[in-house]
Amino acid sequence: LAAKLSYPIADDLDIYTRLGGMIWRADSKANYGRTGERLSNHDTGVSPLAAVGVEYALTKNWATRLDYQFVSNIGDAGTVGARPDNTMLSLGVSYRFGQDDVVAPAPAPAPAPVVETKLFTLKSDVLFNSAKSSLKPEGQQALDQLYTQLSSMDPKDGSVVVLGYTDPVGKDAANQKLSEARARSVVDYLVSKGIPADKISARGMGEADQVTDSCGYKNGRATKAQIECLAPNRRVEIEVKGI
């Protein structure tokens, strides 16, 4: 029984050593003198074993080897009459079981892309005159700055949604129509600057999603103070989604 230690020195070529022990049984028989007396004896034991060799892989299963083995002190002079050493030089072939190709594990699935959403809010009082949907020069300048930011983002397979909002002053239907017209004006301007038309859309939200309280306004005409208080509700939001 021996342990084998190998070291590669070239492709498919290893040198190795084996160290261990060999269990042996020795038998002896002898005839003595004129009487013809026959004597026999036997002994068993374990002797140290050492070997060195080279092994060449012919295929992934078959290999050939040249091996030199030395076993020390086999037997006992007191029982079998001798205690020789044993050496052996051998050339052989071997077959290795379990050498099938290793199947690499399937790669882990790629993580799902993270959809990032950014929101830009512009005041309608900067973009438009009161109750109008045409952009003011100041509004165009604000959109020019926004376009620069959108261009630097360069979203992959992204989309832009422009949402128009009004305050609650006036009739619901009129506010809805105004919010749609203002959102469309912003979309048209950004498309003229270079945003692909199939990547941007407009949506009028009317009086939805107010960001302030009523500021004391109930219905009818609003006071100047109420109009100023309700200003944050008059806005255009640009929602940018990209991967």
Swiss-Prot record:
Cystine residue pairs: 215-229
Annotated segments matching region 5 X 2 AA tandem repeats of A-P: 104-113
Entry function: With TolR probably plays a role in maintaining the position of the peptidoglycan cell wall in the periplasm. Acts as a porin with low permeability that allows slow penetration of small solutes; an internal gate slows down solute passage.
GO biological process: monoatomic ion transport
Residue span, OmpA-like domain: 115-243
Protein name: Outer membrane protein A
Pfam family name, one: OmpA_membrane
Cell compartment(s), UniProt: Cell outer membrane
Transmembrane region(s): 1-8, 13-21, 48-57, 62-69, 88-96
Top-level taxonomic group: Bacteria
GO molecular function: porin activity
Sequence repeat intervals: 104-105, 106-107, 108-109, 110-111, 112-113
Site (Part of salt bridge gating mechanism): 65
GO cellular component: cell outer membrane; pore complex
Organism: Serratia odorifera
Record remark on domains: The extracellular loops are most variable in sequence, and in some bacteria confer sensitivity to phage and/or colicins.
NCBIfam families: PRK10808.1
Keywords: Cell outer membrane, Disulfide bond, Ion transport, Membrane, Porin, Repeat, Transmembrane, Transmembrane beta strand, Transport
Similarity comment text for this entry: Belongs to the outer membrane OOP (TC 1.B.6) superfamily. OmpA family.
Subunit comment: Monomer and homodimer.
Membrane topology: Multi-pass membrane protein
